[in-house]
């Protein structure tokens, strides 16, 4: 198998927002926005250095992103977000490094969200990863494969959750913003879904990539063989059922609602394997800063509870 070259291992913290922006460069950026209508236009760094870095390397990063997707998964993709960031290990300018994040949707049977990070290398940019075998990256495709396998059951749970929360006035982020999430896996309205992969890129392309392109019974059988060999791809499936509540709503009231919501959605969430969680965020989020889950930072702590648990 042909190897994709130019990878750089990254051990520093990637900053999702704009921690180093000068005030005069951010005066037009709103402090908080609503996920109902915000399109994500301010996500990323906005210092002069970020703008220069983005302009210089954007086209190359997009090309390398598309080449990686085609080589690793065998599909085309659509670019949703290209942002610049500044990473700092100290306070001096020399301690700061710049990079790009590219987020897109891979045109698979179950379209999936895919993120790559790039850093400067020579006169260009190279892909950087926290895992030598690209387990973080290939997990996006494995999630889509598992979603394809359990799609009727997952969709039933998602639509049940959607129905329950919408009739009580809760909602999800708009689709344009949803597609700009820095997430590896399947993103749907009210749901983020991912799982584990194997930490070996060459082995992934040899064993998983051919199965991705199968249909029907052939797909199910070959995927089951992979599950038997790598049980973590089923065992560690994660379904996050996500909703937002109005910024003026009482947090304790929402927390009580979430507790009761677990009971009404429990039966459908138990229909397929993996871990499920219900997460509510206050709809007063940063226009640029991301939280530890790579979602726009809410000004209130999340409300979360396990879902699909046996009584």
Please give the residue ranges for each predicted region.
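Exposed beta-strand-loop-beta-strand "reactive/processing" segments of non-cytosolic proteins
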Residues: 77-119
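C-terminal motif of bacterial Sec signal peptides marking the signal peptidase cleavage site
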Residues: 14-17
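Hydrophilic extracytoplasmic domains
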Residues: 40, 45, 53, 270-311
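Surface-exposed beta-loop interaction hotspot
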Residues: 130-216
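Intrinsically disordered, low-complexity segments enriched in Gly and acidic/Ser/Thr residues
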Residues: 195-290
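A short, surface-exposed beta-strand/turn
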Residues: 111-137, 270-275
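Short, non-transmembrane alpha-helical segments in secretory-pathway proteins
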Residues: 42-85, 257-266
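Bacterial lipoprotein signal-peptidase II cleavage site
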Residues: 19-27
């Amino acid at each position: 198998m042909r190897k994709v070259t130019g990878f750089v291992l990254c051990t520093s913290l990637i900053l999702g927002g704009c921690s180093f922006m000068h005030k005069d460069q951010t005066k037009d950026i709103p402090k908080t926005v609503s996920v109902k209508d915000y399109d994500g236009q301010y996500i990323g760094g906005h210092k002069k250095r970020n703008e220069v870095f983005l302009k210089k390397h954007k086209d190359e990063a997009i090309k390398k992103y598309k080449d990686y997707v085609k080589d690793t998964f065998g599909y085309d993709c659509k670019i949703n977000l290209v942002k610049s960031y500044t990473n700092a290990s100290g306070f001096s300018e020399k301690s700061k490094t710049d990079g790009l994040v590219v987020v897109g949707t891979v045109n698979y049977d179950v379209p999936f969200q895919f993120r790559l990070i790039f850093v400067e290398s020579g006169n260009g940019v190279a892909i950087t990863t926290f895992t030598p075998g690209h387990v973080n990256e290939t997990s996006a495709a494995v999630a889509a494969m598992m979603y394809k396998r359990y799609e009727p059951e997952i969709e039933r749970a998602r639509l049940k959750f959607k129905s329950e929360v919408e009739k009580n006035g809760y909602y999800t982020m708009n689709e344009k913003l949803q597609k700009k999430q820095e997430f590896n896996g399947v993103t749907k309205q009210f749901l983020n879904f991912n799982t584990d992969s194997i930490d070996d890129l060459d082995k992934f392309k040899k064993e998983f990539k051919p199965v991705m392109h199968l249909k029907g019974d052939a797909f199910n059988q070959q995927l089951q063989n992979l599950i038997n060999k790598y049980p973590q791809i089923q065992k560690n499936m994660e379904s996050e059922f996500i909703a937002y509540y109005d910024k003026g709503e009482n947090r304790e009231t929402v927390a009580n609602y979430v507790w009761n919501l677990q009971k009404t959605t429990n039966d459908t969430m138990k229909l397929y394997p993996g871990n499920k969680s219900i997460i509510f965020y206050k709809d007063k989020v940063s226009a640029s800063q991301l939280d530890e889950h790579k979602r726009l930072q809410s000004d209130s702590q999340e409300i979360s509870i396990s879902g699909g648990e046996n009584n």
